[in-house]
């Protein structure tokens, strides 16, 4: 089997990730809920994960990291806890439904938003952003990279734009955390949301958000915190403010192991290999007749994603053939990013997405390219 659906979730992970999850399930109590060794051990595991994420993102302090179940929950926390009725937000047509649907729901409560568009290859048009700013604009919300095309957002440009207009910069890093270097301080990012089960190589059910020191977010969920139990209000200090209830300690132990492995290898090293694998695939299919490639795989900051269609064939059928005849795992369809598909003209057909990991090999890439070549000739 060749697994090329890493933009959905990474299947191959360092062995220490699984071991960390198993060890935590056997030994960890409830963090922050006692003074005996199992609960203290759990607290240490959570803190280690917090420290690892802070180091990876170059956050100023581990307390800037609050954990959640995934990037979707983290984005709901950020978007639901920062704005008031009448506020305006700028976002892009590249966004995943984990951004869009919270915004649509908040629109019912009076939130306003505008979409920055893309060109015919799905590339953001930064020069047009100034036209979207209104007197009540409060934030710019952008993806680190499109999960459909792989086109990356120039976060340096986004930061300059946001702070020139006094806006918060909120980044959905689901596709970039762990696979591209990110320095939240250097980039002036106010909130960055991440998921653990993709390039961070952790288990599903893990994720969270970085929150700039001094920025207060109204919690999405309140309840047990392990501290200040007689107070009627949930604690306001980070990260407790955004972490009501018992955390997923085994999952966070696995996430910590994944992130520590990434730090040991070097994010730049992993990024270079993933970029090379995607480039190799692109090189071997870009000139095929009957194959249309979406996005601009040659642009800087491109995620290790190549999306295509073969003729007018439904993308789901291509994905089915790749699995049934070649044992290649890819993702077809809309990828929870409807506005990007509208921009690309692929609402009906969808696209076939190939997404690469450090654990893929050149041999797998070449075998997959050969399969696409065969299908392009047959269909």
Model-derived features with residue positions:
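Pyridoxal 5′-phosphate
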Residues: 1-379
